[in-house]
């Protein structure tokens, strides 16, 4: 993957889901080998809604995640580390005993949980940039930091709160400079009243406006792939509207589509995106010594839709 990406002048960012162990319940859990840290240390694991998660409040678990990311950077010539939005899965996470042991400095469990995530982000920032100062480190949090009804700093929305329900304080990461970029998952349409795409774009623009943190916008292409005739997301119209809005916006370095497989399956989308990105500055190879044998002409011939999406598409994991 690294070689193939670099031969085509693309960056490759390793995608990490920091705490989630399973997504398919007991069958997946039973298939995990005994050598896994999850099986070696069952005291690190919390069951939540039939799935299993590492407990973010345990310092050894935080170190496990940091060490895992560092192992990737040490052994592979990746250009970045990208964390998904799954930290705490919900408010009723069974970590009261962990809070009693490690949370003495916090009067509220929510503040302690957010501090655990902040501590992980800061540790990753320091460790990864010590290994490679040019590495990009970022997170794609859920699109709503907090609703204005709960916090005056929040957005005019009525959706799931990353701050209160998933314990991700992405504003803290931006203000502390512990991420190089932020990529909020704005998987709603323009005009969707509970969580309007344009409203959230403006909120995130303001959030990064006084920082050095780059802003990329996550677009829910999977919604178009799953849409039926008559739906707002059906076809390419909604994606086109969102890209037009982003093209006219400041403080936005690009967009990330979830997912690449979805883009390929939407009727007319590959052709539209090829045209849309055709006038962008061509992708240039990273300033590294990638000793592939592919020629410039061969690279051009082998180019796919991904090569045209030069504005930082990292969603290759589906």
Placement of each model-derived feature along the sequence:
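Conserved, mostly hydrophobic/aromatic
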Residues: 5, 65, 72, 84, ...
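Substrate-binding cleft of secreted/luminal carbohydrate-active enzymes
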Residues: 167-171, 175-193, 210-287
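Acidic carboxylate motifs that coordinate Ca2+ or other divalent cations, activating on Asp/Glu
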Residues: 291
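The substrate-binding groove and active-site-proximal loops of carbohydrate-active enzymes
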Residues: 48-63, 106-117, 158-159, 185-191, ...
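Substrate-binding cleft/loops of secretory-pathway carbohydrate-active enzymes
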Residues: 136-183, 188-200
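Aromatic- and acidic-residue-enriched segments that line the glycan-binding/catalytic groove
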Residues: 20-49, 86-105, 150-159, 231
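Active-site-adjacent "subsite" loops/lids of carbohydrate-active enzymes
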Residues: 13-71, 75, 164-168
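Aromatic-lined carbohydrate-recognition surfaces of secreted/lumenal glycan-active proteins
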Residues: 11-19, 82-83, 113-162, 214-222
């Amino acid at each position: 993957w690294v070689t193939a990406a670099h031969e085509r002048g693309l960056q490759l960012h390793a995608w990490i889901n920091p705490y989630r162990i399973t997504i398919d319940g007991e069958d997946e859990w039973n298939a995990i080998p005994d050598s896994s840290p999850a099986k070696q240390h069952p005291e690190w694991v919390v069951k939540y809604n039939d799935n299993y998660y590492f407990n973010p409040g345990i310092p050894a678990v935080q170190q496990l995640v940091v060490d895992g990311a560092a192992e990737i950077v040490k052994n592979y010539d990746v250009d970045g580390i990208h964390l998904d939005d799954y930290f705490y899965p919900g408010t009723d996470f069974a970590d009261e005993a962990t809070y009693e042991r490690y949370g003495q400095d916090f009067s509220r469990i929510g503040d302690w949980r957010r501090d655990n995530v902040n501590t992980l982000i800061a540790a990753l920032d320091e460790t990864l940039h010590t290994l490679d100062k040019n590495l990009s480190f970022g997170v794609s949090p859920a699109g709503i930091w907090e609703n204005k009804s709960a916090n005056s700093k929040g957005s005019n929305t009525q959706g799931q709160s990353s701050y209160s329900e998933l314990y991700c304080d992405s504003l803290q990461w931006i203000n502390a400079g512990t991420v190089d970029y932020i990529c909020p998952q704005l998987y709603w349409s323009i005009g969707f009243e509970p969580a309007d795409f344009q409203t959230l774009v403006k909120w995130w623009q303001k959030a990064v406006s006084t920082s050095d943190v780059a802003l990329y916008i996550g677009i829910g292409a999977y919604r178009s792939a799953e849409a039926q005739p008559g739906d707002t997301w059906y076809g390419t119209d909604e994606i086109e509207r969102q890209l037009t809005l982003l093209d006219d916006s400041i403080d936005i370095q690009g967009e990330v589509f979830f997912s690449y497989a979805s883009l390929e399956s939407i009727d007319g989308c590959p052709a539209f995106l090829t045209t849309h990105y055709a006038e962008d500055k061509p992708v240039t190879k990273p300033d590294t010594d990638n000793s592939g044998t592919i020629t410039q002409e061969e690279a051009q011939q082998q180019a796919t839709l991904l090569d045209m999406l030069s504005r930082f598409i990292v969603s290759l994991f589906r």
